[in-house]
Amino acid sequence: MMIHKIEPHKYYPEFRNQEPKPSDYLLLFDGEKVYLPSHTENSDVTDTSAGAGISEHPQVYLPTFEEVHGLLGIRQPMERFFLDCEYLFSIDDRAFFRKTTEDAGALMLPEEDLYASGVFRNFEPEYLAFAGITATQINRFRLDRKFCGRCGHPTIHSTTERACICPECGQIEYPKISPAVIIAIVDTEQDKILLTRYAGGSYRHWALVAGFVEVGETFKGAARREIRSEEHTSELQSR
């Protein structure tokens, strides 16, 4: 998912101490899985265009706080349900928040409504797919930084920036961004392009040559290295 695919929508990633509203989107996580209900569970949902869907599960959608509160039959007032929610980002004037089942008092979610992050590859519309993918990345960062990597003490969330702070030794951890390159190798005479297929992993589709930039390496250097490693083992496919 590329950020330009959410146009004409605008993405606002800056950190905010913002309180949620019932109409804001909630990404409710159980570990690394996210809660995505279906429209058939909520007969009151009328705006299916905003709810999105997945090609093989077209009725699955990204819910708001109000919808989650009603669907799961949560008895506590909405104001209390808002507690322990993390503001993630906004797209246009809609805010997105993260909450975990642990934060919600060991809330039990229906197993059939829990999905791995790969579900957002085929999510529609694309700006909500982008939101889901970005939210799962932040969720993974929080899960991986529950404890300090230096002294092992439990970390806390910063109140001034998106970071995990160790109150014991002062170590600060930020979300990691891994620079990568994607290269289109084209044979203009044959009107073909070089595509690869991964030997392992869950993604089995054809893809362009790509790879991560190593420490101290330039983007051009990474592109050359990836081309050398792939060009003898890949196939040329017609465009």
Located regions from the model:
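N-terminal alpha-helical interaction blocks
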Residues: 1-125
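Surface-exposed, charge/polar-rich loops and edge strands
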Residues: 217-218
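Acidic, metal-coordinating catalytic segment for phosphate/diphosphate chemistry
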Residues: 132, 136-182
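N-terminal strand-loop-strand
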Residues: 164-208, 212-213
